[in-house]
């Protein structure tokens, strides 16, 4: 259903790696085409290596810096930088810096009950050894 989504409408969930505000998900908008999240990674926090078997993803860094892994490649991203991740590609976002990182994340299509599913692979090789 078409609607305005105000900040007070955003449902925020807390994870081991930080917070995610569900700005656009089936439970909020009824849209099953995509999911939009506002993510904050506090200094020293990460969304460790994982993949989305049924979803493509775009991450746009709005503020702060992160070390973004895409497969076994990494790059430091700053405000305005982004990464596109095809479905089933392992990736991870790490805030190795002294300030919070704010990301806007879009996943498509919406999948699962909340619109978002991830498979943690951070304890599997080679991912478990990549960050030392």
Regions found by a protein language model. Give the residues of each.
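A short, N-terminal "cap"/entry segment at the start of jelly-roll beta-barrel domains
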Residues: 1-33, 118-132
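Conserved short histidine dyad/triad with adjacent acidic residue
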Residues: 21, 37-52
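Short histidine-centered beta-strand/loop micro-motifs
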Residues: 25-29, 47-52, 94-96, 120
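Short, charged/polar surface micro-motifs in flexible loops or helix N-caps
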Residues: 30-34, 42-45, 65-66, 109-113
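Conserved hydrophobic/aromatic beta-strand scaffold that supports enzyme active sites
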Residues: 36-40, 58, 74, 82-84, ...
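A short beta-strand-loop-beta hairpin characteristic of the jelly-roll/cupin
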Residues: 46, 53-79, 89
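Ligand-binding loop in jelly-roll beta-barrel domains
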Residues: 79, 87-113
């Amino acid at each position: 259903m078409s609607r305005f989504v105000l900040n007070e409408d955003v449902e925020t969930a807390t994870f081991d790696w930080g917070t995610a505000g569900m700005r656009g998900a089936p439970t909020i908008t009824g849209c099953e085409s995509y999911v939009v999240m506002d993510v904050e990674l506090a200094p020293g926090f990460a969304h460790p290596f994982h993949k989305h078997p049924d979803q493509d993803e775009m991450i746009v860094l709005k503020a702060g810096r992160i070390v973004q892994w895409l497969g076994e490649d990494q790059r430091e991203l700053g405000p305005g930088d982004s990464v596109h991740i095809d479905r089933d590609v392992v990736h991870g976002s790490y805030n190795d810096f002294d300030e919070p990182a704010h990301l806007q994340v879009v996943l498509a299509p919406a999948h699962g009950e909340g619109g978002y599913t991830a498979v943690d692979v951070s304890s599997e090789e080679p991912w478990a050894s990549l960050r030392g």
